[in-house]
């Protein structure tokens, strides 16, 4: 995928891309990178190199803890699309559904009812999607 844009040809981009794929999954990352155009490519480069290649690769916090932090912060910001993405990432990083529900309940006290209701609905939708993916016909 990265051979499409020359600005994506850096070691830092590849480092970030690997972590991003491990957390968010190939399908999501492939869509994001493929959709990068002249307007959005600089943001994709920044996020992949610095968010994923620099911050997510730092020592000191394991990925599971980073996911806990992200869920809390994204919930507080009331960003449903990003919350949905990071619920999947949190599951990929080893959080259980029960832990995700507890994060939402903890956040309800500090972020308020509307935010927590939205976060819970979002988490439920992700759980249902995953359950649908694993069902056998």
Predicted regions, residues:
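Short alpha-helical scaffolding segments that buttress acidic/His motifs in well-ordered protein cores
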Residues: 47-51, 68-75, 103-108
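Short basic/hydrophobic patches in alpha-helices and adjacent helix-turn junctions
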Residues: 89-93, 106-109, 125
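Mid-chain, well-packed structural core segment of small domains
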Residues: 71, 75-101
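Residues at alpha-helix boundaries and the short loops/turns that link adjacent helices
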Residues: 23-26, 80, 94, 110
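Acidic, glycine/proline-rich low-complexity segments that act as flexible tails and inter-domain linkers
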Residues: 1-64, 92, 118-137
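Residue-level detector of well-ordered alpha-helical segments, enriched
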Residues: 43, 64-68, 82, 99-103, ...
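C-terminal structural segments of small proteins and small subunits
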Residues: 111-116
